[in-house]
Amino acid sequence: MQAEELKYLPHEAVIKKVAPLATLDNVVSGIPAAITLAQFIIESFWGRSPLASASNNCFGMKKNLSGNNWPGSTWTGKSMTWVSSEASSGETVRQPSEFRVYASVEDSITDHSAYLAGAMNGTDLRYKGLRWQLDYRTAAQIIKDGGYATAPDYVEVLCAMIERYNLTQYNVAQPPFLVRVTVPMVAARKGPGSEHPATVVVRGPNVFTITEVQGSYGRLKSGAVAALQRVNPHAKQRADAQ
Protein backbone atom coordinates (compact mmCIF):
# COMPACT_ATOMS: atom_id res chain seq x y z
CA MET A 1 0.00 0.00 0.00
CA GLN A 2 1.15 3.53 -0.79
CA ALA A 3 0.39 6.35 1.66
CA GLU A 4 -0.85 8.38 -1.28
CA GLU A 5 -3.82 5.98 -1.50
CA LEU A 6 -5.05 7.22 1.89
CA LYS A 7 -4.87 10.90 1.12
CA TYR A 8 -8.56 11.57 0.46
CA LEU A 9 -10.17 8.85 2.56
CA PRO A 10 -12.31 9.64 5.62
CA HIS A 11 -10.82 8.71 8.98
CA GLU A 12 -12.87 5.54 9.43
CA ALA A 13 -11.82 4.29 5.98
CA VAL A 14 -8.14 4.88 6.80
CA ILE A 15 -8.49 2.82 9.97
CA LYS A 16 -10.26 0.06 8.04
CA LYS A 17 -7.34 -0.17 5.57
CA VAL A 18 -4.47 0.18 8.05
CA ALA A 19 -5.85 -1.76 11.04
CA PRO A 20 -5.35 -5.23 9.45
CA LEU A 21 -1.71 -4.33 8.77
CA ALA A 22 -1.24 -3.24 12.39
CA THR A 23 -2.91 -6.39 13.73
CA LEU A 24 -0.81 -8.70 11.56
CA ASP A 25 2.30 -6.80 12.63
CA ASN A 26 1.19 -7.18 16.27
CA VAL A 27 1.20 -10.97 15.82
CA VAL A 28 4.75 -10.89 14.44
CA SER A 29 6.42 -8.11 16.47
CA GLY A 30 4.45 -8.00 19.71
CA ILE A 31 3.94 -4.24 19.38
CA PRO A 32 0.29 -3.49 20.26
CA ALA A 33 -1.79 -2.67 17.19
CA ALA A 34 -3.49 0.17 19.10
CA ILE A 35 -0.12 1.87 19.59
CA THR A 36 0.85 1.35 15.95
CA LEU A 37 -2.45 2.79 14.72
CA ALA A 38 -2.43 5.76 17.09
CA GLN A 39 1.14 6.66 16.16
CA PHE A 40 0.34 6.19 12.48
CA ILE A 41 -2.57 8.63 12.77
CA ILE A 42 -0.65 11.22 14.79
CA GLU A 43 2.72 11.05 13.04
CA SER A 44 1.38 10.93 9.47
CA PHE A 45 -1.88 12.84 9.97
CA TRP A 46 -3.94 9.89 8.78
CA GLY A 47 -1.40 9.11 6.05
CA ARG A 48 -1.87 12.55 4.50
CA SER A 49 1.27 14.37 5.64
CA PRO A 50 3.64 15.55 2.90
CA LEU A 51 6.39 13.35 4.37
CA ALA A 52 4.18 10.25 4.29
CA SER A 53 3.01 10.96 0.75
CA ALA A 54 6.55 11.51 -0.49
CA SER A 55 8.28 8.64 1.31
CA ASN A 56 5.71 6.25 2.87
CA ASN A 57 7.35 7.20 6.17
CA CYS A 58 4.27 7.17 8.38
CA PHE A 59 5.97 7.39 11.78
CA GLY A 60 8.51 10.18 11.40
CA MET A 61 11.37 7.68 11.48
CA LYS A 62 14.65 9.54 11.03
CA LYS A 63 17.65 8.23 9.13
CA ASN A 64 19.77 7.64 12.22
CA LEU A 65 18.12 6.11 15.29
CA SER A 66 19.74 4.22 18.17
CA GLY A 67 22.71 3.26 16.02
CA ASN A 68 20.45 1.67 13.36
CA ASN A 69 21.27 -1.72 14.85
CA TRP A 70 17.92 -3.34 15.62
CA PRO A 71 16.90 -6.63 13.96
CA GLY A 72 14.07 -6.92 11.45
CA SER A 73 14.46 -3.51 9.80
CA THR A 74 12.89 -3.12 6.35
CA TRP A 75 14.70 0.15 5.59
CA THR A 76 16.95 -0.05 2.52
CA GLY A 77 19.11 2.97 3.37
CA LYS A 78 17.31 5.54 1.22
CA SER A 79 16.49 8.87 2.87
CA MET A 80 15.30 12.38 2.13
CA THR A 81 15.69 15.79 3.80
CA TRP A 82 12.55 17.19 5.38
CA VAL A 83 11.80 20.12 7.68
CA SER A 84 10.06 18.99 10.87
CA SER A 85 8.83 20.58 14.09
CA GLU A 86 10.65 19.65 17.30
CA ALA A 87 10.04 20.69 20.91
CA SER A 88 13.12 22.24 22.51
CA SER A 89 13.31 24.06 25.86
CA GLY A 90 9.56 24.53 25.89
CA GLU A 91 9.46 25.97 22.38
CA THR A 92 8.61 24.47 19.01
CA VAL A 93 11.32 24.92 16.40
CA ARG A 94 11.44 23.84 12.75
CA GLN A 95 14.63 22.28 11.48
CA PRO A 96 15.74 20.08 8.57
CA SER A 97 16.40 16.41 9.25
CA GLU A 98 17.07 13.25 7.26
CA PHE A 99 14.09 10.87 7.20
CA ARG A 100 13.79 7.28 6.00
CA VAL A 101 12.13 6.42 2.70
CA TYR A 102 10.13 3.19 2.39
CA ALA A 103 8.74 1.26 -0.55
CA SER A 104 5.34 0.88 1.10
CA VAL A 105 3.23 1.60 4.18
CA GLU A 106 3.74 -2.04 5.19
CA ASP A 107 7.52 -1.55 5.24
CA SER A 108 7.08 1.59 7.32
CA ILE A 109 4.96 -0.28 9.87
CA THR A 110 7.38 -3.21 10.03
CA ASP A 111 10.45 -1.01 10.54
CA HIS A 112 8.66 1.10 13.15
CA SER A 113 7.72 -1.99 15.16
CA ALA A 114 11.16 -3.56 14.74
CA TYR A 115 12.63 -0.34 16.13
CA LEU A 116 10.27 -0.25 19.12
CA ALA A 117 10.90 -3.94 19.81
CA GLY A 118 14.66 -4.03 19.35
CA ALA A 119 16.30 -0.59 19.59
CA MET A 120 18.93 -0.41 22.30
CA ASN A 121 19.90 2.33 24.75
CA GLY A 122 23.30 1.25 25.92
CA THR A 123 22.94 -2.33 27.12
CA ASP A 124 19.16 -2.15 27.68
CA LEU A 125 16.21 -2.11 25.34
CA ARG A 126 15.15 1.47 24.73
CA TYR A 127 11.46 0.54 24.97
CA LYS A 128 11.72 -2.33 27.43
CA GLY A 129 8.34 -3.78 28.38
CA LEU A 130 6.49 -2.52 25.31
CA ARG A 131 6.08 -5.84 23.50
CA TRP A 132 2.71 -7.47 24.31
CA GLN A 133 1.86 -4.59 26.65
CA LEU A 134 -1.94 -4.39 26.46
CA ASP A 135 -2.30 -1.50 28.93
CA TYR A 136 -2.14 1.31 26.38
CA ARG A 137 -1.35 4.00 28.95
CA THR A 138 1.65 2.04 30.16
CA ALA A 139 2.69 1.42 26.54
CA ALA A 140 2.38 5.12 25.67
CA GLN A 141 4.49 6.09 28.69
CA ILE A 142 7.19 3.58 27.73
CA ILE A 143 7.35 5.16 24.27
CA LYS A 144 7.58 8.67 25.71
CA ASP A 145 10.20 7.68 28.30
CA GLY A 146 12.27 6.02 25.57
CA GLY A 147 12.57 9.36 23.79
CA TYR A 148 10.41 8.64 20.74
CA ALA A 149 8.73 12.05 20.78
CA THR A 150 9.69 15.47 22.13
CA ALA A 151 6.14 16.81 22.63
CA PRO A 152 5.45 17.09 26.40
CA ASP A 153 1.82 15.95 26.01
CA TYR A 154 2.59 13.00 23.71
CA VAL A 155 1.25 10.36 26.12
CA GLU A 156 -2.06 12.18 26.54
CA VAL A 157 -2.45 12.72 22.79
CA LEU A 158 -1.66 9.08 22.04
CA CYS A 159 -4.10 7.77 24.65
CA ALA A 160 -6.85 10.15 23.53
CA MET A 161 -6.54 8.85 19.97
CA ILE A 162 -6.73 5.24 21.13
CA GLU A 163 -9.82 5.95 23.23
CA ARG A 164 -11.62 8.02 20.61
CA TYR A 165 -11.43 5.34 17.93
CA ASN A 166 -11.43 2.29 20.23
CA LEU A 167 -8.13 1.15 18.76
CA THR A 168 -7.53 -1.49 21.43
CA GLN A 169 -10.03 -3.70 19.59
CA TYR A 170 -7.27 -4.41 17.06
CA ASN A 171 -4.76 -5.66 19.65
CA VAL A 172 -3.66 -9.28 19.76
CA ALA A 173 -2.91 -10.97 23.07
CA GLN A 174 0.44 -12.70 23.42
CA PRO A 175 0.11 -16.29 22.16
CA PRO A 176 1.01 -18.98 24.70
CA PHE A 177 3.51 -20.59 22.33
CA LEU A 178 5.05 -20.37 18.88
CA VAL A 179 4.74 -23.17 16.34
CA ARG A 180 7.87 -23.53 14.19
CA VAL A 181 8.16 -26.27 11.58
CA THR A 182 11.59 -26.85 9.98
CA VAL A 183 11.77 -28.77 6.69
CA PRO A 184 14.11 -28.97 3.66
CA MET A 185 11.38 -28.01 1.17
CA VAL A 186 7.93 -26.42 1.14
CA ALA A 187 5.48 -26.57 -1.78
CA ALA A 188 2.31 -24.46 -1.67
CA ARG A 189 -0.41 -25.80 -3.94
CA LYS A 190 -3.77 -24.66 -5.27
CA GLY A 191 -5.53 -27.23 -3.09
CA PRO A 192 -4.80 -29.97 -0.55
CA GLY A 193 -3.08 -32.99 -2.08
CA SER A 194 -0.16 -33.54 -4.44
CA GLU A 195 -2.47 -33.77 -7.46
CA HIS A 196 -2.86 -29.98 -7.36
CA PRO A 197 -0.16 -27.93 -9.14
CA ALA A 198 2.31 -26.06 -6.94
CA THR A 199 2.18 -22.26 -6.97
CA VAL A 200 5.51 -21.84 -5.20
CA VAL A 201 8.31 -24.11 -4.03
CA VAL A 202 10.91 -23.07 -1.44
CA ARG A 203 14.05 -25.15 -0.91
CA GLY A 204 17.09 -24.70 1.29
CA PRO A 205 18.50 -25.40 4.74
CA ASN A 206 16.24 -24.63 7.69
CA VAL A 207 13.21 -23.60 5.62
CA PHE A 208 10.41 -23.00 8.09
CA THR A 209 6.91 -21.70 7.45
CA ILE A 210 3.19 -22.04 7.87
CA THR A 211 2.19 -20.43 4.63
CA GLU A 212 -0.60 -19.32 2.36
CA VAL A 213 0.54 -17.94 -0.99
CA GLN A 214 -2.01 -16.28 -3.28
CA GLY A 215 -4.80 -18.55 -2.10
CA SER A 216 -2.58 -21.63 -2.11
CA TYR A 217 -2.71 -24.51 0.33
CA GLY A 218 0.09 -26.64 1.75
CA ARG A 219 0.22 -29.83 3.80
CA LEU A 220 2.37 -28.11 6.43
CA LYS A 221 -0.18 -25.38 6.84
CA SER A 222 -3.03 -27.88 6.97
CA GLY A 223 -1.36 -30.12 9.54
CA ALA A 224 0.00 -27.31 11.68
CA VAL A 225 -3.32 -25.49 11.81
CA ALA A 226 -5.16 -28.68 12.72
CA ALA A 227 -2.68 -29.48 15.50
CA LEU A 228 -2.77 -25.94 16.80
CA GLN A 229 -6.56 -25.89 16.86
CA ARG A 230 -6.68 -29.01 19.02
CA VAL A 231 -4.99 -27.09 21.84
CA ASN A 232 -6.24 -23.60 20.98
CA PRO A 233 -9.55 -23.40 19.07
CA HIS A 234 -9.03 -19.68 18.41
CA ALA A 235 -5.62 -20.06 16.79
CA LYS A 236 -6.67 -20.63 13.17
CA GLN A 237 -6.93 -16.95 12.27
CA ARG A 238 -3.48 -16.24 13.62
CA ALA A 239 -1.98 -19.27 11.86
CA ASP A 240 -3.63 -18.34 8.57
CA ALA A 241 -2.06 -14.90 8.82
CA GLN A 242 1.49 -16.25 9.01
What is each PLM-predicted segment?
Residues 1-178:
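Catalytic cores of secreted/periplasmic lytic hydrolases that degrade extracellular macromolecules
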Residues 189-191:
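Core beta-strand residues in small-molecule sensory/regulatory alpha/beta domains
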Residues 100, 197-200:
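Residue "hotspots" at secondary-structure boundaries inside conserved domains
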